[in-house]
Structure formats: structure tokens, C-alpha cells
């Protein structure tokens, strides 16, 4: 079993100092086994494993680690992990990588387990095991890092457990970035989270995605969200706010592992936003970085310089509206 191939403490963007304030990422800390294969086998079939890696999740944890690589100070507020083998494995993994997190161990819960199978098409097939008891440990997580925060990141799939952090951020006028994935038609989710959300990211590379990007962005803006980011995988992306729409064609890359690409998009957008970049520049950079991430296994992020270089080459169309 291999371990992730980068170290946050010696990242290539160490000289890129960020603005004052920490990006706080709030969510579940899970043990993830990353499996790279040439092709996902047919049902009741098999195939060769190219690489097997002890890794970590969920998206909030990944975004926090990627922000650190980009040179942006971050802090991950996690759920607890169990006093079990998987808990010890993921604790060792995030510690070795320098992920900015204080791991809590709770012997009454089982560590969240995930298996992500990634193939060169960019697709991921994943399995996970969560318990209500584990999720409930988010309700007692220490929110004091929000006192000096510049942004809050959350994942919709952590449910009502993220509301406490979102409400706290809103009271302190801290912008909130929510990963909504494919839940743009889920009225209950939007009604619950949209009032606290400033930036929302949606993924439309799932098989069930039948709506066009512009329709999705309209749904999100009409729900009260200020900025909608629609990530279309290897094809394109769309960013929309009250005054403009930015359509970006993604660069073509040789895909090794699509795991973490959405998180890289999120982290890169937040990185640019905190530096005062406009919507087009943030979206170009996020699209470039998410695509470039797919060239390597795991969560290695391309340097800011290289990401900006590729971002400047992307075909982009900007429309302004009232």
C-alpha cells in the first residue's frame, strides 16, 4: 500500500502568501482508499489495480489541504474519527501530509470508510460507510477558528450538521462556499442552505445531470445565492453572478486520476477570490487547476504560476447583464 505522494509542508507555492484570515473548511474526516485502474470491470468481472493508496476525505478536508498547497492559510474543522484501525490510518496520513487539522478521537464511533476507484476516463466509482453517530460529532466540533476566518467551505451532504457553522459565519459576515454537487433541483436542500450561501459549486458530470448549465445557474441565483459555479468536468465550466456570465472551455489533459478535481476547482476559486480577482480570472484559474490536477494521482495541486499560465490560454466568453 502506497501513501500520498506530496507533502503540504514543502509545497511549491510556499512563497505565495495569502491575505489575512484563514479559510475554514468544515466537514467529515474519512479514511479513503484510492484505487487506480485502467478500466472499471464489468459486473461480476475483475481487472488489474495500477495503484492502491491510503488517503483521506471528504471534500472539505481535501479543499483545506489543497489551499495549503496553493499557499493559502486554511484550517479543517473535522468530525471525530474512531479509536480503530482506519482512524489511526487516516490520522497518520493527514499528519504526515501536514493537513491543518486537530484530529478528535472518539471511541464510541466508527471512522468513516470510503473506497474510490478512478480510471483514465476521469470517472470515479466510489463506496462509503457513514453512521449517524459519527456525523453527530460535527455538532460538538470547535468553531473558534471561524473567529479569524476569511471564508467558510462546507459540503451539502453533511446535512443539518453544517448549519451551525454556516449560521456562525453569516453572523460574522464571513462568505460561505457550499459544494452542492448535483442537488440543484433539491428544493429542500436549497431552502435550507441558500440563505447562508454566497458561492455555490455544482457538478454536472454525473450521469443523472439532464439540465443545461445556464438553467442550473438561474435556479441557484433565484434561490438567493450570489455566485453560481457550474463545473462540467473535462468539457467546460460556467460562472454566473448578478452582472455577468463567464463560459470557459477546459484544457485537454492526459487524465490519470479525476479524484479531487472538484475540490481543486473549489480551492482554486477561493484562492483567487481572496486575492481580489474578478469572476473571469477566478473561474479561468479554477478550471485550469481542476483539469491539471487530473494528470496526477491523489491530491497534488499544480503550482500557481503554471495554473495561471494555462488559465490565460483558455477560450472564454463573457456576457454582461443587468
State where each predicted segment sits.
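Glycine-rich phosphate/adenosyl-contacting loop at the front of the ribokinase-like
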Residues: 1-77, 85, 92
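Conserved phosphate-binding/catalytic region of the ribokinase-like
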Residues: 2-24, 213-322
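Conserved N-terminal subdomain of the carbohydrate kinase-like
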Residues: 16, 20, 45-50, 69-150, ...
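Structural motif
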Residues: 22-24, 150-151, 199
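Glycosyltransferases and closely related glycan-assembly transferases
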Residues: 147, 163-176
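Catalytic beta/alpha-barrel core
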Residues: 152-158, 179-181
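Conserved phosphate/ATP/ADP-binding segment of small-molecule kinases
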Residues: 170-247
